[in-house]
Amino acid sequence: MADERFVVTNLRFATACGMSDRLRLDLVLNDFVAGALTSGKIDILSDGTPWRPLIHVRDMARAIDWAIDREPDNGGDALSINVGSDVWNYQVRELADAVARILPGTEVAVNPDAPPDKRSYRVSFAQFAERAPNHQPLVGLDDAVSDLVDGLQRMAFGDPDFRSSQLMRLVALETLRGKGLLTDRLEWTTKPK
């Protein structure tokens, strides 16, 4: 199977956002857009200062395309690489404000009494910029928000209880476990249909 051109590329993606056939609303930007559409409000559970790197699903696909065609002289036989863009490192409050810009009238509420969020992180994507200059993220934040708004409106989304729906990964996993289709180790017990 392997020859001198065989390479392994581990793509460490920033947090995904955007519409997809398997939409997830437990991702920060997707959650904010869904909340704004259903309630006119975004509740930030932290003080809004934690950092999150994001990448749109279309840009993730572009990175996969790059990884499939990557040559060994571009990073070696085995490469682990952060995939995203340095300009897509945002504070949570900035993400909520972007949604409110696209959906005027959206109220943004932060929790000033929240303890510091230990999940705050900024990521360097310099290596990806160097190794994949023709596959850099193209979708901007406002376009990502608009894409989500349009997609959710097209599917007539309006479930105010979406956080307990199958569009949340943990809910979907618990449902599959409850039906006996997944083990506690998240392995299939039978082949899914």
Sequence positions of predicted segments:
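C-terminal substrate-binding subdomain of Rossmann-fold SDR/epimerase-dehydratase oxidoreductases
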Residues: 40, 45-193
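Helix-to-beta-strand junctions that scaffold the AdoMet/dcAdoMet cofactor pocket
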Residues: 37
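Intrinsically disordered, low-complexity segments enriched in polar/charged residues with Gly/Pro
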Residues: 20-22, 29-30, 108, 124-125
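Active-site proximal helix/loop that lines the substrate pocket
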Residues: 15-21, 49, 88
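The catalytic Tyr-centered alpha-helix of NAD(P)H-dependent dehydrogenases
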Residues: 13, 21, 25-29, 53-57
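Conserved beta-loop-beta element that borders a ligand/cofactor-binding pocket
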Residues: 1-20, 30
